Amino acid sequence: EEMPFNRAQRAWVYRAAKNLDNTQPFGSTRDLRPPGTLLFANATFPALETATGPTSPLIIGPECAQPYASASFFNISAMSYGAISKPAVLALSNGARLAGCWMNTGEGGLSPYHLAGGADLVFQIGTAKYGVGDGQGGLDEARLREVAAHPQVKLFEVKLSQGAKPGKGGILPAAKVTPEIAAIRGIPVGQDSRSPNRHPDIADTAALLAFIHRVRTLTGKPTGFKLVVGDPGWLDELCREIIRQGLSSAPDFITVDSADGGTGAAPMSLLDYVGLPLTESLPRVVDKLVEYGLRERIRVIASGKLVNPGEVAWALCVGADFVNSARGFLFALGCVQSMQCDRNTCPAGITTHNPRLQRGLDPQDKAERVRHYVENMRHEVAIIAHACGAATPRQLRR
């Protein structure tokens, strides 16, 4: 019951999503003694409330034809329609619009329900290229342009790997491949939807940069990539290749996913043993970008088990520009951590396509909970920032 998220972590999200007071009496229940415990250094003279202000927008891809400016440092991470249900996607897309944050489509393509909410969208290009593929493992430029023509689609994210299963492609079980989902993805109905373990046309760093440049040129929109860091030495190779080719070759952002990410079901051998956790990888990515003079060119997005204000504030301190969460938003929708995500039997109606189980998930009601979760997250991260002497959360430093 206490793993992977303990009762206190879940309770904070539930209360925040319901817009309830999260004030607690009688001291912390968190054990502050273990080495490595996350603690913030409060300022002797903290920032006065009169000196604080709203978070300013950050621009992603300023050199693009259509750069994107976002003021929200907390956003919805990648979860595809198929992995989660129609009412869940509707609730998230509507809630994201209300909260003024973005929503990542996940690798399953662009569905009508992503668009219905009116939120800003990040279109993820997974290894199977669902929705923009040519059927042979390559990119269909015409289909890509069709997706980019939607004004709601603001960014494109090339997925190299994800926290739950670095080195392995995504799997959507046959029970969840409905006719509608099959049509959106361009796959057979009622068969397992399996993505390759990597993009067939991206075999090295130069090819990655070339692919990003191609997508950005075709769409006119900021393009980056998502990965779980394995070998930190590869970061040097990436930075050197960018410098060799010129700054115009650089990705507009890098999404650093933690090895303990987990919206996708995966073999336990990958869940438990492969990839670096965000506590190890995020500082390395930020430091390498600074070392090579690329930090101002490339935005950094952190994801992976960041569901409470302290964890989000930590990521901003370390150097992330934005934080994405997936499971935090599942809790906001009513997830009870029943661990049935891949079985089409989710009792909360979030990861099932069974209409009977979906009846308890009202998209309008849950959209408000998504909104409250984002707003309360931003508010409490700001409280931490002010206690540390920072006027806004993005001024936090390690």
Regions found by a protein language model. Name each.
Residues N75-S85, T127-G137, G169-I171, S195-D204, ...:
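Active-site mouth loops of central-metabolism enzymes
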Residues F123, K129-G131, A174-A203, G264-T279, ...:
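Glycine-rich tight-turn/loop motif centered on a GG-T
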Residues E1-N42, Y273, R284-R297, V307-A313, ...:
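Alpha/beta catalytic cores of nucleotide-metabolism and tRNA/nucleoside-modifying enzymes
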Residues A148-P173, P232-G233, E237-D252, V256:
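Carboxylate/His-rich catalytic cores and anion/metal-binding grooves
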